[in-house]
Design a protein with these regions (language model features):
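Glycine-rich nucleophile elbow surrounding the catalytic serine of serine-hydrolase chemistry
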Residues: 1-3
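Lipolytic serine-hydrolase domain surface
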Residues: 5-139
C-alpha cells in the first residue's frame, strides 16, 4: 500500500480516497496510533475489530496483540474504530464483507464504506466513551 500511495498519481495534496479500511488488520496494535495518524490519503480511516477473529487468533500465537482483534488502546485521533465482536451472527468470522453472515447491519456498513459514504452513522452501531469507537449492537 505504501508504494502505491507514493506513486506519481498521488503527487497532489488531494485525498484520493474517501475511506480507507483496515479490515481486521494483522498488524501490531501497540503504537498503531503513531503511524495511523500520519496516513494522509483518505478522508476517513476505518479499523474493523472482532476480538474472536479465528484468523487473527492464529497470528496471536507468534505476534504481539493484533489491531484487528484487540479492543484496547484504541487511541488514534484519525481512526474510526468499528467493533463487531458482540454483534449478532459475528462469531469468529474474519471476512465480513462477503455478506455470508446474515447480519444486515454489517452488510449496510460495508455497502456504505465501500461506496465512499460514512459507515459509523448507520443505525445498529453505538459509540461508547470519548474515543472514536463504535460497537455493533445487533442485526
Amino acid at each position: 500500500v505504501e508504494q502505491f500511495v507514493r506513486s506519481p498519481v498521488f503527487s497532489s495534496d488531494t485525498r484520493i480516497f474517501d475511506n480507507i479500511i483496515f479490515h481486521q488488520a494483522d498488524v501490531d496494535n501497540q503504537r498503531h496510533k503513531f503511524w495511523m495518524d500520519r496516513v494522509q490519503y483518505g478522508r476517513r480511516l476505518y479499523i474493523t475489530i472482532n476480538e474472536n477473529d479465528r484468523v487473527l487468533k492464529g497470528s496471536d500465537l507468534i505476534n504481539p496483540a493484533r489491531l484487528g482483534n484487540t479492543s484496547e488502546d484504541l487511541t488514534s485521533k484519525r481512526a474510526i474504530y468499528m467493533d463487531f465482536t458482540d454483534g449478532d451472527d459475528v462469531g469468529r468470522e474474519h471476512n465480513f464483507f462477503t455478506g455470508d453472515h446474515g447480519n444486515k447491519t454489517i452488510e449496510q456498513f460495508f455497502q456504505r464504506v465501500l461506496t465512499s459514504r460514512r459507515g459509523e452513522l448507520i443505525q445498529g452501531f453505538q459509540k461508547q466513551g470519548q474515543n472514536n469507537v463504535f460497537y455493533l449492537q445487533g442485526k
